Amino acid sequence: MQVEVDLPNHSYHIKIEEGCFSEAGDWVSHLWQKQMITIITDSNVEILYGESLVNQLKKQGFTVHVFSFAAGEASKTLEVANRIYGFLAKHHMTRSDGIIALGGGVVGDLAAFVASTYMRGIHFLQIPTSLTAQVDSSIGGKTGVNTSFAKNMVGTFAQPDGVLIDPVTLKTLGNRELVEGMGEVIKYGLIDDIKLWHILEEMDGSIDSILDNALAIIYHSCQVKRKHVLADQYDKGLRMHLNFGHTIGHAIEVHAGYGEIMHGEAVAIGMIQLSRVAERKNLMPRGISQDIYNMCLKFGLPVHYAEWDKDVLFDILSHDKKASGQFIKIVILPQLGSATVHQIPLEEMRDYLEK
C-alpha cells in the first residue's frame, strides 16, 4: 500500500507494507544519493532495529552514524536536541546529507525538529516503529520538543522525504505501548472516517485483534491524516480537527509528568472529558461521549485521570497553541465520523475541566 502526499512545495509517499523494513536500505537509495546519514533513535529501538538499518544502508554505499538517546518522553527537549546538533557538527553533516528518524513518536518529533533547524534545514526520512507514530506523528510535517510549560511548545513545520511503515514492528512493542496508539486511531474514526469506526466496532479489543487489523487501521488513519494535511498544511483550519481531545490531553501529559501518562492515553481521556461537557452544553448529540468511553475501555485505554486538578490543568492549557488572546479553539463532533472547530472564551475551558 502507498499513500501519496502531494503538497504544493513538496511531495512524498508513505509506504505501508508488512516486512518492508527489511528493504529499508533499498528504499532509501531510491530517494537519496549516496551521502552521509545520521540515524536518530532511542535506546530501546536501537537494540531492536539499529544494526539492521545500519547494515542495509552501508550495503547501499551510505556513510552511516547513529545517535541514540534514553527512551521516553522526558528526552524530547531542547537539551537533547542541542546534543544532537553537536553530534551532527562533529561528524561534519552538511545540507546535502540526511537524517533518518527510527522509532516512535518521541524519536520522530525530535529528529524532525533537529533536521528542520540544523543549518536551517536538512533532508530527513521517517521510519516509525510504534502505532502512534505510524498512524499520526510521522505524517504531516509537525515537529517539536516539550518545555516545562507545554507539550510541543517549540517546533516547526517540515515535511519528510518519505515515510516507511512496517506493521510487523508493532509485534515488538509492549502491550501498553501498542494500546496507547489506539487513542489516535479511535480519534481518526471519530473525526472523519466512519468506515474506520465500524472496523473498530467489529474488533474485540484484544492485542491480537490490533495486530491482525494493523494494516487496515494504519492505512485508514494515514488517509485521514493525508486529507487534512493537504487541505491545511499549517494547521489553520481543517487540520485542527486532528486536535480532537488533545487540548485536555496535552494538559494531562504535562501535569502527570512527561512519560507518566502516554500520549494516546491522555488523548483518550481528553476526548471523553471534552465530549461529556460538550453534550451538557448541547454542542454535541447525547450519547457520543458514551460511545467514545466504551470504545476506549474495550481496547484497554484509560478513561479516567486519578490526579485531576482542574485549576492546575487550566493553567497548563492556557499555554496551548490553540489559544489566541482570550479565546481558544476546541474540536467537537456534530456526529460520529464528523468534526468541526468551535471557538470559546479561554475562561470557559474551566467548564470543560469539571468532572
UniProtKB/Swiss-Prot annotation:
Q: How is the cofactor bound?
A: Binds 1 divalent metal cation per subunit. Can use either Co(2+) or Zn(2+).
According to UniProt, the reaction catalysed is: 7-phospho-2-dehydro-3-deoxy-D-arabino-heptonate = 3-dehydroquinate + phosphate
Cite a single GO BP annotation. aromatic amino acid family biosynthetic process
Query: Which cysteines link up through disulfide bonds?
Result: none
Q: Name one GO cellular component term.
A: cytoplasm
**Pathway involvement of the protein, from the record:** Metabolic intermediate biosynthesis; chorismate biosynthesis; chorismate from D-erythrose 4-phosphate and phosphoenolpyruvate: step 2/7
- Tell me which InterPro entries the record gives: Dehydroquinate_synthase (IPR050071), DHQ_synth_AroB (IPR016037), DHQ_synth_fam (IPR030963), DHQS/DOIS_N (IPR030960), DHQS_C (IPR056179)
Pfam families documented for this protein: DHQ_synthase, DHQS_C
User: Chief location of this protein?
Assistant: cytoplasm
Q: Spell out the subcellular localization from the entry.
A: Cytoplasm
Gene Ontology MF annotations: 3-dehydroquinate synthase activity; metal ion binding; nucleotide binding
Q: What is its EC number?
A: 4.2.3.4
The residues that hold Zn(2+) are E184, H246, H263
Q: Which domain of life is it from?
A: Bacteria
State its role.
Catalyzes the conversion of 3-deoxy-D-arabino-heptulosonate 7-phosphate (DAHP) to dehydroquinate (DHQ).
| Similarity comment text for this entry | Belongs to the sugar phosphate cyclases superfamily. Dehydroquinate synthase family.
Tell me the protein's name: 3-dehydroquinate synthase
Point out the gene that encodes the protein: aroB
